[in-house]
C-alpha cells in the first residue's frame, strides 16, 4: 500500500486556495453564507503567509502550536511571542529568541474566526530558575484531553536559553482555556526532548513524538493513562536522519507523520512517513511537496495536522513561516490535506 498512498496539499492558485479552504469548511463555516454586510468582522478565508487577525482585529499569536477539538469548539494553543527578537551575544548559531511570554489560546467554531482566550500558561517572572522564566525557551505546546481524568494536559518543549536543557514540560487544567498549572519538566525516557507533539489514538492511548539524541532521532513514547508522564515504552525512529517538527494524524487506519529537517529557523525539505501501528515500523515516503519552493516546504515548517470534524477525510495541515529576526511576525500556512493517489504538495509562490 505504501506506494499508492497520497498526502496531497493541492493549491493551483491563490483564489482557488481560498475556495478549497471554504469548501473543506463548508457546513462548518456558517459565516460564509451570510451577506457581506453581516460578516464585516468575520474572516471568510485564510490566505497562507498573510496576517491572520483574531476577532478583536489583532494578529493571531500562536506559533509552533496545535489544535484541540472539544465540545463543539476548536482551541488553538501556541507560543505567544511578544517583544524584540534578539540574537544573544554568546550565540554560536542563529538562536534568535524572544523572552518567554507564555502559551496563548484562541477558540473558534469554524476554524477561520478565532477569539483570544488569553495566556493560559504564563511566564513566571519572579524566579530566574523556573522553566517558564522569560529568559528561558518555551516551544511547541500541544494540548490533549484525558477522558478518564477530565483533565486537559499540555506538553511542550522547555529549554535553557542555550538549548542545553532539552526537556519536556507538562501542565494541567480543568478547562480548555486554563489556567494551566505547571507540573515540571524532565527528559522522557532519559532522553533529550526538543521539537515535539502529542497524539491521542482512537483507543484513548496517548503518545509523545519528540526529536532526541541531539535532534538526530525521533522518539515515540507511550504515555501513562493520565497522560502526565512516559509509560516506559518507547521506540527510536529515523535514527541519524535529523527530523524535527513532527505532526501526526491517522487516515484509513494508517498513521502518518509529517516532519522537517533540522536547519534552525531556516526552511528545508519536508518528509512524510507512514506506519501500520504507532509503535511499529515507520516507512518514509519522501517529500510530499512539488512545485515552486518544494524543497523549502514553501518557506514553512510543520507543526500540526487537524481533522475537520464533521467532514469526511478532511484535514488541515498547519505550518509556521518563521521570521527569525522578527519572530512575533512569523506567519501561518494552513493547507488542506486530500488523500487520493499520489504523494505531492503543490502551492504557488506567495
Regions found by a protein language model. Name each.
Residues 1-41:
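Bacterial Sec-dependent N-terminal signal peptides
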Residues 78-115:
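Beta-propeller domains
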